[in-house]
Amino acid sequence: SASAMDFKMTISRNLKHYNPDLKTIVPEHFYFFDRTSTTAANKWTIILDIDQSGSMGESVIYSSIISCILASMASIKTRIVAFDTNIVDLTEKSDDPVDLLFGFQLGGGTDINKSIAYCEQFIENPAKTLFFLISDLDEGGNRAGLLRRISDMKESGVTVISLLAIADGGKPYYDAQTAQKLAGLGVPCFACTPQLLPTLLEKALKGQDLSKFEKMK
């Protein structure tokens, strides 16, 4: 089951294989140590809804790495969706980190509401679904619709996390008003460093407190 995964070891071993000089990922074997059998009933679904507008470049790189690592884990169903004003489902590219990275096309506007609507079809068991919205929340589409969909997701039992950025340092740009409204719905909103992603995933899947991450905003 997902709770049997050693997320810190598995993810940390692979995050380092992005080579900034080559501007590509040089992966090693993916590691997964599962101590229990997995059935459809106890399998988690993790949905990564990734903003590929121009301001999200560094976050896209780290999102692609984490997506491939998660997709390699048999105890998790992973869906990878990229969006600007259009939507691209990159799930089928997740077995090749380089192929996945080049599936992203940076630039364009942002329609977060549209992407969330697309992702809703992948929620089969809300209590076993973790939805990451990786975006600076600079919505160019229907902001009220975005908030309504997130609220409905939360009420159904989905664990929703808004990652404003995945970056090594610095204060990220994000739409503070939308972030505040999401926080009012009980959605944690924060930026995260790549090094803390393993801990974040572990705590989120175990339903643990994420308040220390929110202080990083």
Annotated model-derived regions:
Residues 149-217:
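Von Willebrand factor type A / integrin I
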Residues 64-66, 144-150:
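Charged helix-capping and loop-helix junction motifs
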Residues 1-44:
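Negatively charged sequence features
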Residues 48-53, 128-141, 165-167:
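DG-centered beta-turn motif at the end of beta-strands
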Residues 62-82:
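An active-site-proximal "capping" alpha-helix that borders the catalytic cofactor pocket
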Residues 88, 97-132, 139-140, 144, ...:
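Von Willebrand factor
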Residues 83-88, 167-168:
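Short glycine-enriched loops at secondary-structure junctions
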Residues 11, 34-63, 67:
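MIDAS-like acidic motif and immediate structural context at the N-terminus
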